[in-house]
Amino acid sequence: MQARGQVLITAAELAGMIQAGDPVSILDVRWRLDEPDGHAAYLQGHLPGAVFVSLEDELSDHTIAGRGRHPLPSGASLQATVRRCGIRHDVPVVVYDDWNRAGSARAWWVLTAAGIANVRILDGGLPAWRSAGGSIETGQVSPQLGNVTVLHDDLYAGQRLTLTAQQAGAGGVTLLDARVPERFRGDVEPVDAVAGHIPGAINVPSGSVLADDGTFLGNGALNALLSDHGIDHGGRVGVYCGSGVSAAVIVAALAVIGQDAELFPGSWSEWSSDPTRPVGRGTA
């Protein structure tokens, strides 16, 4: 299977699995910056058999201080979550959302960092499923308890590459900022106390790797995007955003074309919390 097929699944492919009766665990990870709790929307309509996962409460650990707005969960707490969701050994997992692939990319990153195999993002999310004529169910889904084992208790040192704040600021890595340009420039900052970016970072908004319909760009377009920003394919790349959510979209997009990338989980919310760290503003 090519890299793209290891990261993404199309609505047609998923529908085929469901119709064939093939086992699959589907996680609904709806999350928006302005509406972080997607549970009500989930209850109103979701993919058949999908289980809701809270990005805020289950894919983050807010008891951790000093690591940004969405610290990574512990392996133990994540194992309880994925077993609640019915995830089993050797059963594929599909994650989806309805906005900008942020929720599903975060789930994909967290689950794969934990050592869970065969996790894919529904390309285009819920809109793609609806456009393909996929059926929708309502209400809560409570599956049989799963048995999957999380292999890493510390996801900061799990199976996906990460950056610390010190590493993000030390150079030696091409650092990408996945936030919208106005936040990168420091024109506005709707969430964190300080506006701006990590000096030396390149602004590659998470939305720039998606087509108008919310699917990931084709491999050729993704490679061209790297070239346009002067990013060497195969070189060391780090990615951050506000708090380690939308940056996962860029990490996933790079994985689609076989490029590893290191996520800075604390991102700008961690970096900017220390007044001794430098702040870049403007386009450079």
From Swiss-Prot:
Q: Which domain of life is it from?
A: Bacteria
Top enzyme category: transferase
Is Magnesium among the key words of this record? no
Q: SUPFAM superfamilies, from UniProt?
A: Rhodanese/Cell cycle control phosphatase (SSF52821)
Pinpoint the Rhodanese domain residues: 20-138, 169-280
Q: Which residues form a coiled coil?
A: none
- Listed binding positions for substrate are 183
Q: Which PROSITE patterns match?
A: RHODANESE_1, RHODANESE_2, RHODANESE_3
Query: Entry's Gene3D superfamilies?
Result: Rhodanese-like domain
What Pfam families would the database entry show? Rhodanese
Q: Which UniProt keywords apply?
A: Repeat, Transferase
GO MF annotations in UniProt? thiosulfate-cyanide sulfurtransferase activity
* EC number of this enzyme: 2.8.1.1
Q: Reaction(s) catalyzed by this protein?
A: thiosulfate + hydrogen cyanide = thiocyanate + sulfite + 2 H(+)
The active site is formed by 241
Q: What else is known?
A: Was identified as a high-confidence drug target.
* Domain notes per entry: Contains two rhodanese domains with different primary structures but with near identical secondary structure conformations suggesting a common evolutionary origin. Only the C-terminal rhodanese domain contains the catalytic cysteine residue.
The protein's name is Putative thiosulfate sulfurtransferase SseB
